[in-house]
Amino acid sequence: MSLFTALNSTPHDALLEAEEHSRELQVEESFRVFQSALFHLKAKRFDDAEAKFEQLFNIEVLKPDHWGLYRYSSPTLDLLRYLAYRNRGVFYYQYVREHAEELDKDDIVDYILKVVENLLQALQHSDGDAAVTGLLLQVFRGFKSKRLQRWILEYELTKQPEEMLLLGRGRALLPDTRGLVEEYRRVLRDVRSEPVTEFAARVLTLVKTDSLEVQPLPPVLDKIEQLKDEDDAMMKQLAEYEVNLEELSWECIAESFRSLVPKYKYTNFFSKAPDPYSEAGDPIECIKFVHNDKPIEQEVMEQLSVQNEREPFAATQAATEAPTLEKEGSENGGRTESKRDSELPSDSQRPAQRSSKRFKERSTETNEAELLRPHQDFAALFYSCTGILEVRLEIELSHLNPEAIPSTYPAYMPMLDFYECLNSWTSKHTEFLNQSETKGTSKNKGKGEDSFQLTSLLRSSMFTEENRPTISLTELPYKEVAEFISTVNSNRLHFHAVRLLLLQVLLTVRPDGSCLITDTFWSPILYDTIESFVLSLESNIYDLVYSQSEKYKGLGLSFCEVLMNSLGGIYTEIHAKKISGGKYGELEAQKNKLEKKIDRWVLLLDQLVFEGKLKFRYLWSKFCYLQCISDVTDDRIIHSLDYITHELRNSSMDIDISYANYEHTPRLNMETVQSQLSKIKMMRKFTMVNQMDVDRNDSSNEDQIEALSRVLVGTSLLDTPEDRSMSEFVNQAPFLLKIKLWRIVLHHYLAVKDQSNFQICYFKVLHVLYERLCSKEYSDQSQLQRQQTLLSTLSLMRSFTSLFIELLSGANEWVINDTSQASEYFKLLIDVFILLYPLTYFETLSQKSATTVSFFKKAAKSSVILKDMFVDISCLLVLYFTGACTQKEVVNGVEVATEFIHALHLLIGGFTFCDAANGNFLNLAEHFFCSVEGSSSFIPLKQILLCKYRLSLGGDANSFEDHGAKPQVLEMHNAVRLAKYLIRFEYQNKNPYLISTNRSNLKQVIENVIDVIGKIPYAENHILARNVYYFEQYLEAPVTAKIIQEALQGCISIELTKPRDNLQEIVDLGLYYISGVQLLNLYKVRKKTLQARPSELDSIIETLKADILYKTNRFETWFLLGKCYSYVVEDDLIWTSDRLVVASKKATTASIQRKAILCYLMALNLCQLSVDDPSLSEAQKMENAFIKREIYEVLALELLNAYFKPMEGLPFQRDIAPALVLTETGELVEPKNSPQPSISSANIYRATLLVFTNADEMYKDSQDALQNWLNPHYIANLRFKHEREDFITDGFDIIIRACNLAMKASTSNDNIIEPHYSLVIKCYKSVKHGWLRPEDALKHLLNDNSFLAQEANFYSHNPENSVQDFYRKIITLLRRLLALDKRKWHHRPTYRIARILFDDFNDVDGAIQEMGVLMALKSVNKNLVNIWKPEYERPGKHFVYTYQYVMFYLKLLSHKNDYISLGHAARKMRRFGSGMVNGSLATDKAVEMFINGARAALGINEKEHAELLLPTLNYQAFNRYSDELIASFNKENYSYEVLESLAISYQLKKGSSGIAFDGVCLSIYFKYLYLPWVEEHEAAEATQSMVKFVEINKNVNPTENETASPQPAAEPQKSTTKQVSSRKRVSKKDAFDKISQIVDKIT
């Protein structure tokens, strides 16, 4: 094949050519498929035709891209596409004509639309023929689309422009063209309302009128035309929205009507699209109200007929039988708070499951006594407490049914009303309860806020007396509601029309002159809905009023009033935001937009003439608007009020407009106007004073507050004219204005924390409010008025009480400074408490009665308000009860108060709201109980802690109740106070260290307290930082003889200072000390079960360190700190020997051990100082003596561990400070200074012995029945090591005493072996050194025969017998000790037996056999020495013993020349290096012994058999012979010694990076394996004949041969040396590779 490529040809061109060719083939294939489709279509085989069309349009050239475009275009392709789409459209048309009877109308329409789609697609590729345009024209006629008909006609007429010349000659046109022109004329006539184009005008002027008969449509298209007519008729029908009404009321209509449109945030009403209807998905063309799935008219008529037939009934009965439940939430999403808080019923308000009457009665009888028990228990204690203070109650709390309240009781009527409110609570009651609520809290008020409150009174809606309620809208007859519904349903009104009609009914003036929005009381949902309608339609209604002012001026005035009320709400919220420091920029924007709207309305309404009530409504609304936007100093306000007053006086009408629904618009009557006028004048006076004396603004405000306080309290000190003027103003002011003034005064005293004046004012206003409820004026009101008065008064009581609680609980003090009037105040609080008591009793009644719904479940939000008030009043009741007890000096007043608080807690906790009012009651109870000394408050406190913190102090869980309180976070001041109480209660002056029981209850609390306190910032307190420095300086000091002496004398001192911060008291009380005791006890328990971790000690050390740094001078803390360090050292030394092998790690451990010794010395020092403390009781002195003895013991033991192995006195070493030395040459050098001992060995010995002796002697002065055997045991050991021969005088008596004490301390399962072993060994050593005769030693051993249990003759010794008989008896006793070891942990007797056998009997085999028990030479265990640490073995001594045993065992094996066992030992010791001290020395010794033994036993010479042999070997021959040797290797052909030596040496070489084992391993391989194999096969290998073992003995120099020149490959070799020198050398690695394979077969 030729590789020629033309210069003008590229691969891309080839690809294009191939693609073009492929496209041509596709076109051919398309035409073939198209012809086949036409063939099937002509034969009316529609399924086959459809398949072919589907195949046709799947061909690539007919498929457009995602955008509907085609990649390639050509005349052929355009024609193909036109024909394909055209004929597929025809196919669909023919199919639907043939199957029109079988298809439903939807399928017919779908197919016709496919026809249109394909035909229109065909027109995009080529000009359509007459058949296409004719078919499209018929289809468009069927769809009755004139525009499409006109388009297709114009398309057909303009398709050939040359035919335009023939338009003037009618006879020259073909009939088809004439038909098109006539059709075009007809279409233009039908669409004559549209402008005619220039072309159409020319056609109409040129063509002669020639009426042609209209051809009828085919049946299929005629059916389409019919369907089109049906659709048009259907579209003309209005879409009816059915609105379901739950009841027939304006509220329900408004609520359901508002739900038709999307919910709107309040801010959206000020946007460009304020109407939420604009956001609706579908238009609401027609609204129809329905109720219970039947027309509303029928329902209305039925209810009206029933209403006319029966008598009117009381509102209470209606409320009881069908209460309207509160609904939570607000539609006003743009504001921070809803203007009218409402509530939703909880899930528990669902109808209860029906049960039989018999079951209900039986359940009620059974549970009634149990239900009333909480009230009976509380009442009994309550009466007992009030009786102590000689307060007589006129009512029985245990049975407080409404019918049981005495009619003579002062609060009889308000209590009945309270019960009625609870029973029939509705959203109306919620409105009453929230009427007096104010936004913001006192905590957010700054200085000077009181004066601002004075001026802000003008913007309050609570001006008038009582704000007397008017008739409720729901109480009006149903007639108007029915008429409205009938009008809407009969006229089929649009959404806008219904909304406008509703606004007209509710906002316009009625024929009798009344207006529903101003003269009736609405529910919050109704007013909120109307307000949203007003904000949505404000612009449209403005245009309506502007155009038809006389007709709609009442509606416009109502709109303006609603807008002004909304503006007042925004002003109020802005004020609240300013007080709380919140952001109010959005509210400012809303205010500005709303003011612009109102200004436009005011200008419009100013042009209208109002008469009658409308006139006064307009004047009053302008005044309210002016009041919002102006300051109190604005004269327009006074002028406006004067004008209104003048008009009211001159009016013949009695003007009294309630404005019940306007929260920020006051009632309009003469009394209101005059009150407002006088109030403004007074406020102007205050404001003018502020403006004239700006420099004394604060003082003048305070003077005004003080004057106002004197006036309100009613003091007679009204000397100045200003005071008298203010008094007149206050006396004439309405009640709620006085309440506002009271609030200002109380806020002021709260801000300055003046408890005395606040107390006077609080109880004065509380008395006024209570007397208001008990007055005749209250009883004379209607029930609805009484309920409003009651709930608003309770709300005021709650508000003032919460302020008082805030003042009393400041800094968590809960203290009443002035208790001189506590008894009188307590009586008033009792009256208020009884007034509120139905809140809890009603819940009990609701549980008794199946028809009564729980108030707490029915009205969740409102119940929270009343719960808070009940709890706050309970707190004051407790405080003033304790104050009254103090005032009257009641005996056991604290105990009675404790019971009273606990009873109150059980009462309110039983109803699950003891944590109400931000947990005030729980805070007070906790504060009081923690301040009580004694155990009376412990049980109540446990219940408080369970509720407040979910903190359980143990005990029987069933004895405490779960009140469902939300847990609070434990704060520091509470935590500290709680810890103080519990520490005093739990320990009661006992030392926590000596209490054996684990106070787990206190442990949890202590941990929580410490967690709350957190890590103490020592660096932030200069005293603590100083203490840290001196503390660390002491712990870094060396242990000297002086410091030990000073500790024993109590003369050590550290310059610590008490920081005296907020933690000093609790630390002095023992918080951190107790925590350290508990944590250390827990660590000990975990340590016994091997679960403790050393890291746990870090937190304990930090805890104890905190106690020391606060200078508590508690010697127990130093003692425990020393124990922590001892545990750290013990953990370092017990588990691995790394801390003993690595010098740096051992130095760290020694430093910690030195700290432990210093801590013990300081503990001993402080303990010595406390001995002479006269303030200590005898019990405390005994406790201190007990701890002092333990300090002696641990100090002595720590000194012992530090001095002897494995630490070997390292903690007593100190580094010499670096110094520069001048040498002889004049250079300054820093000499290497080795650490020097800080105390001599003799002093360590004397100190240790002295401390042990002191500890042992202290047992004589104590009453302990069991002494510590370790003290005499260690005393004896120390003396024996130091005194040696002198020890025998009295030393054995000490050992015998230790043995006797150990026997008493032993148990049947665990015998203490150590002192008995010590006795046996000391007797043995004394005899061996000649210090003691065998018979004398046996006498000492006889003293311990109760444990050794030998025959009497065993201890007899004939002087003629040899000493070895005595040694045999020693071995017998040692075996006896091993037998008594139940746990099999002791190993020293076994070692000593082996030692005696070897040293005294020269029995190497016996010694090896004994040591074999301790050694695991050939086991799979990696440890060579298999021993356990006995309980009383000193830390780290285990690794010393291991090293001792290993070295002795190696010595035994060396004496026996057992080099194989030495090799196994060396191999294991490489893996067991961390199990002993000096592991590397022991390993090197074992290796040395093995190598020497192998050399001697196997007669190998490493130089001869390895170093000199390797260079002489032929590489290829070595590999071949070695492979043959490995392949035919058989262990039976070699001795055990050779194979084991080879395996051991290779394994040692593999585990070592050195070359110590190379020679031995290679020598064994070549001498005993390789060379004998070569000698056996050298006869067959001539090339290797000159490599003889004997030639090596001739001192052949391989260097010379290696330097010889290589011979040519074809030249015969002339000498062996030349042959060797020319090949590759055999390396050690090559040899070891072969050896490894041999070793694998051996092992």
Swiss-Prot record:
It comes from Eremothecium gossypii (strain ATCC 10895 / CBS 109.51 / FGSC 9923 / NRRL Y-1056). GO terms for cellular component: HIR complex; nucleus. It is found in: Nucleus. Residues 324-343, 361-370 have a biased composition (Basic and acidic residues). Has a role in a nucleosome assembly pathway that is required for the integrity of heterochromatin and proper chromosome segregation. Disulfide bonds: none annotated. This is Histone transcription regulator 3 homolog. Residues 345-354 have a biased composition (Polar residues). It comes from the Eukaryota. The keyword Methyltransferase does not apply. Residues 311-370, 1598-1629 are annotated as: Disordered. GO terms for biological process: chromosome segregation; G1/S transition of mitotic cell cycle; negative regulation of chromatin organization; negative regulation of transcription by RNA polymerase II; nucleosome assembly; transcription elongation by RNA polymerase II. InterPro entries: Hir3/CABIN1 (IPR033053). Its main location: nucleus. The keyword Transcription applies. Belongs to the HIR3 family.
